Amino acid sequence: VRGIVSVEIRLEQAGDEAAIYKVTTDAFRGRPYAGGDEQDLLNRLRELGQLALSLVAMDGDQLVGQITFSPVTLSDGSEPWFGLGPVSVTPEHQSQGIGSQLIRSGLDEISARGALGCVLTGNPAYYQRFGFELAPKNVPKEEPREFFQLKLLSATKAEGIFAFHSAFYDSHVR
């Protein structure tokens, strides 16, 4: 860790789209876990009205990070549940705590909105610090069991299988 940088976290605004696209592209380029279309996924979710929450990190007037939360469904019908991701920080600003600030701010916001919990597919060693735990009983069939995680934000238990929006799997969904 190079030291914690203080950034302003705010809601995505009209006009941020191009900078978010670039940050996301740059953040995932060449990463072994990247699908390669994270930036296009964000645009699909936005176009489909599935960005429940999009926060950006500003270093002065430069957009240096972004996090997305989208609605997910649980087969037991309980709601609302959210999926976290992608979360992106420009390569030159990584390892400075910006991703952590985005994640904590986003979790606080969806919790304030009444979220029952949040799921994601990601590195357990990274996300456990935010209270995420592996959720093998709830994993969607499309997701790897060893990376699917859940953080409860209420007393409600997750009974059933989660599903991300089809935009996560089909680049032609519009």
Where are these regions (language model features)?
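Short alpha-helical functional segments enriched in proximate histidine and acidic residues
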Residues: A27, E109, Y126
